[in-house]
Curated annotation (Swiss-Prot):
Cofactor: pyridoxal 5'-phosphate
Native species: Aeromonas salmonicida (strain A449)
Protein name per the record: 8-amino-7-oxononanoate synthase
N6-(pyridoxal phosphate)lysine modifications at: K241
Record: residues binding substrate: R26, H138, T355
UniProt keyword list: Biotin biosynthesis, Pyridoxal phosphate, Transferase
GO biological process: one example: biotin biosynthetic process
Gene Ontology terms, MF aspect: 8-amino-7-oxononanoate synthase activity; pyridoxal phosphate binding
């Protein structure tokens, strides 16, 4: 105890006890390292099927060398917000590289995807606007949408008929994801682009989990689905998943970026990402653009895993991306299955409410190009035959 009185206006213990009783209490696990699809915890080695390091770049020697060189040149921190002295030539070069890669006019860097998403919504939407969101959008988008003065309307997951019924002309912003973080399926971007253009509303993609993995040169969901970058007004992506570093960006028109520089409080009032980090991300993009074989290997692993789980009788979501959700149903059952896998040397995280809807607790299994075929086979052996699980049918409707 730190000597402060426990009593007061906040009932913390009761809230924690309630979550623990419902098998929803979250606890952190301190790892001793995570490299190349492996994880070490308390001196024991595990196969790691929980990370978002989709291309296995988080321990790449070339990226690490770029990071170290950046530290030698620029130090360990940027030292200020980007509008003071925290914006360097290395940041500018990264923005230009991203704009060229993704086919947008300009890019703005953020410290993380959560702040990038919230910065955009808060800067753009006022009381006279409308915001349309997929029900399964990331918590950063849902949370900010609920706090804004505009009216937020949520449509059923990937339900374009429902969205079209809700739309009003020239009223605001439609937001959806490229690859949904808990289900691994993709948004229908040709149809989203059509509806946005038809209604005169802006369109934003959160492509945190598609960037680097999908499309030619890893340009993401839009490129994979043949949607022109100009059809989507705002692109958000992150560097901490397939790119193996950390940070995020927002891309679009030069006017959009200039506006965010002036009105996005998350950008204006935050210390900028370390310059050395920008150097590492720039090097990562070089590798990602040339990583066709890694993406092909990853696709083969996904196919192998899906075929193997089908043979064992497990229920997977309709995903062809590295995110493979194995539906369990009850939170306690998901925790028990995750514990069983850990006993067998495989680390997979159980995802429970409120991250996912009640009754849809799951194992969020993520594959990486760092995995080998024998790693996938070991995961399948650890899972074993299904002894009964929930069904995906009808989960996302209504």
């Amino acid at each position: 105890m730190n000597g402060l009185a426990v009593k007061g206006p906040f009932v913390l213990g009761a809230a924690l006890a309630e979550r623990e009783l419902a098998a929803l209490l979250r606890r952190r696990t301190a790892t001793d390292g995570s490299v190349g699809g492996r994880l070490q915890v308390a001196g024991r080695d595990y196969l790691n099927f929980s990370a978002n390091d989709y291309l296995g770049l988080a321990d790449h020697s070339t990226i690490k060398a770029a990071f170290k060189e950046g530290i030698d040149c620029y130090g360990t921190g940027s030292g200020a917000s980007p509008l003071v002295t925290g914006y360097s030539r290395a940041h500018q070069q990264l923005e230009e590289t991203l704009a060229d890669w993704l086919g947008v006019e300009a890019v703005l860097l953020f410290n993380c995807g959560f702040s990038a998403n919230q910065a955009v919504l808060k800067a753009l939407l006022g009381k006279d606007h409308l915001l349309w969101q997929d029900r399964l959008n990331h918590a950063s988008l849902q949370e900010m949408g609920s706090q804004l003065p505009c009216k937020m309307k949520r449509f059923g997951h990937n339900d374009m008929t429902a969205l079209e019924r809700q739309l009003e002309p020239n009223r605001g912003l439609i937001v959806s994801e490229g690859v949904f973080s808990m289900d691994g399926d993709q948004g229908p971007w040709p149809e989203l682009a059509r509806l946005a253009a038809q209604s005169g509303n802006w369109l934003m993609i959160d492509d945190a989990h598609g960037l680097g993995v999908l499309g030619p040169e890893g340009r993401g969901t839009l490129a994979a689905q043949g949607v022109a970058p100009a059809s989507v007004h705002i692109q958000m992506g992150t560097f901490g998943k397939a790119l193996g570093v950390a940070g995020a960006f927002v891309g679009g028109s030069r006017e959009l970026v200039d506006y965010l520089v002036n009105f996005a409080r998350h950008y204006v009032y935050s210390t900028h990402m370390p310059t050395a980090q920008a150097c590492a991300v720039s090097k990562s993009i070089e590798l990602v653009r040339a990583a066709d074989e890694s993406r092909a290997h990853l696709a083969r692993l996904i196919t192998r895993f899906r075929q193997g789980t089908a043979a064992l009788g497990w229920q997977l979501g309709a995903s062809d991306t590295p995110i493979q959700p194995l539906l369990v149903g009850e939170s306690s059952a998901a925790l028990q299955l995750a514990a069983r896998l850990r006993d067998r040397g495989v680390w997979v995280s159980a995802i429970r409410p409120p991250t996912v809807p009640v009754g849809t607790a799951r194992l969020r299994i993520t594959l990486s190009a760092a995995h080998r075929e024998q790693d996938v086979d070991r995961l399948l052996k650890a899972l074993g035959p299904c002894s009964g699980s929930a069904s995906w049918e009808g989960i996302h409707h209504g």
